[in-house]
UniProtKB/Swiss-Prot annotation:
Described function: One of the components of the core complex of photosystem II (PSII). It binds chlorophyll and helps catalyze the primary light-induced photochemical processes of PSII. PSII is a light-driven water:plastoquinone oxidoreductase, using light energy to abstract electrons from H(2)O, generating O(2) and a proton gradient subsequently used for ATP formation.
Site (Susceptible to oxidation): W365
Bilayer topology term: Multi-pass membrane protein
Cofactor binding comment, as recorded: Binds multiple chlorophylls and provides some of the ligands for the Ca-4Mn-5O cluster of the oxygen-evolving complex. It may also provide a ligand for a Cl- that is required for oxygen evolution. PSII binds additional chlorophylls, carotenoids and specific lipids.
Source species of the chain: Spinacia oleracea (Spinach)
Protein name in UniProt: Photosystem II CP43 reaction center protein
Gene this protein is translated from: psbC
Length: 473
């Protein structure tokens, strides 16, 4: 059961750096992989691989808890979250914990509880990881057949896939329950500048939910990233949760069809490559979502989006010059277009100047000033509220720009604040991780396909320089 086939047949190109070093008896001779290849040594040791995965989960959860507490310890309630370099507290605030009207933090205790719960969970996972890595059975197939598997067993693999899908569906429903029953979530569109509210009228219409998927990714369409009310977001999670759970049950109860058996490679490395591809797609979508969407990622916590900061600047100076007596409806700019207001390609009244390229921005502080044909001149003259002025001035000076040395803001802007927006960090990190995961997908997919075809192109190791060097030890 342990070794259906020799791994060395599939991986003939691995060369040992240090022939005498073995880790816990899992050496290159028995696994086909040297110590530095990490979990590849555990491909056929399901018990030890379980330990590695549980320990890894423990490290992830430990980071979450420790970083959470670190952010709580450094948090200053008087400053906006996005000015403090926080990347975890904005997520907790978005879920409606500890915040009130306008996104003001009124209680940090829920954040503390979150950190402690994650630390406790990480201890449990850490213990489980150490137990399965060092003490538990090497393989699960004999003693716990339900948890055992053989990579080539297609039926078992789709059952495991089904279990994962059900867990993902439950995760989607956790957000739904939080929004519907457990205190609600933060809605940046709530009247007067955002507030926590329970979502009562969830969007379940398939034409709306799946219509997002059919939108163009460009311009004013924006694919799923254009979603701009919480009813749609929570409704989308209801649909995703149902689809994941039903799909999970389907995969548990059925065996792969003949076309799938032929089309896919059925090996551990192939499954790794599929997973990396999926995570890569998630990373790229998350990058765009964080960068452009100010509903799922409220600007009160993450800072304004790029278009939002730009439009806020135009709005701020419109307010200033209007007070100084400018006629903002007819003033001409240096290009001959409107200085403060102009028309979009489709006829709406929009902000003039360089920010015209961001004319399709939608933001809670700006929408009340729109009429049926874009920005409403009479509202701009009579209806601008102090909170809209304050927020736009704040967003104008906190554009999500930054450089590698963490000197943020617009380089030429005398009013800018030296900071780096968490929006920049989250967007950039997810893009970079998405890219590397995609490269990993290509790498492992290529190896898995080569192994399945019975050959593997590798470097010819006969004359490799390392072979003539003295061993490390």
């Amino acid at each position: 059961m342990k070794t259906l086939y020799s791994l060395r047949r599939f991986y003939p190109v691995e060369t040992l750096f240090n022939g005498t070093l073995t880790l816990a008896g899992r050496d290159q001779e028995t696994t086909g992989f040297a110590w530095w290849a990490g979990n590849a040594r555990l491909i056929n040791l399901s018990g030890k691989l379980l330990g590695a995965h549980v320990a890894h989960a423990g490290l992830i959860v430990f980071w979450a808890g420790a970083m959470n507490l670190f952010e709580v310890a450094h948090f200053v309630p008087e400053k906006p979250m996005y000015e403090q370099g926080l990347i975890l507290l904005p997520h907790l605030a978005t879920l409606g914990w500890g915040v009130g009207p306008g996104g003001e933090v009124i209680d940090t205790f829920p954040y503390f509880v979150s950190g402690v719960l994650h630390l406790i969970s990480s201890a449990v996972l850490g213990f489980g990881g150490i137990y399965h890595a060092l003490l538990g059975p090497e393989t699960l197939e004999e003693s716990f057949p339900f948890f055992g598997y053989v990579w080539k067993d297609r039926n078992k693999m789709t059952t495991i896939l089904g279990i994962h899908l059900i867990l993902l569906g439950i995760g989607a429903f956790l957000l739904v329950f939080k929004a519907l029953y457990f205190g609600g979530v933060y809605d940046t569109w709530a009247p007067g500048g955002g507030d926590v509210r329970k979502i009562t009228n969830v969007t379940l219409s398939p034409s709306i939910i799946f219509g997002c998927l059919l939108k163009s990714p460009f311009g004013g369409e924006g694919w799923i990233v254009s979603v701009d009310d919480l009813e749609d977001i929570i409704g989308g999670h209801v649909w995703i949760g149902v689809i994941c759970i039903l799909g999970g049950i389907w995969h548990i109860l059925t065996k792969p069809f003949a076309w799938a058996r032929r089309a896919l490679v059925w090996s551990g490395e192939a499954y790794l490559s599929y997973s990396l591809a999926a995570l890569s797609v998630f990373g790229f979508i998350a990058c765009c979502f964080v960068w452009f969407n100010n509903t799922a990622y409220p600007s009160e916590f993450y800072g304004p989006t790029g278009p939002e900061a730009s439009q806020a600047q135009a709005f701020t100076f419109l307010v200033r010059d209007q007070r100084l007596g400018a006629n903002v409806g007819s003033a001409q700019g240096p290009t001959g277009l409107g200085k403060y207001l102009m028309r979009s390609p489709t006829g709406e009244v929009i902000f003039g100047g360089e920010t015209m390229r961001f004319w399709d921005l939608r933001a809670p502080w700006l929408e009340p000033l729109r009429g049926p044909n874009g920005l409403d001149l009479s509202r701009l003259k009579k209806d601008i509220q102090p909170w809209q002025e304050r927020r736009s001035a704040e967003y104008m000076t906190h554009a999500p720009l930054g450089s590698l040395n963490s000197v943020g803001g617009v380089a030429t802007e005398i009013n800018a604040v030296n900071y780096v927006s968490p929006r920049s960090w989250l967007s950039t990190s997810h893009f970079v991780l998405g890219f590397f995961l995609f490269v990993g997908h290509l790498w492992h997919a290529g190896r898995a396909r080569a192994a399945a075809a019975g050959f593997e192109k590798g470097i010819d190791r006969d004359f490799e320089p390392v072979l003539s060097m003295t061993p490390l030890n």
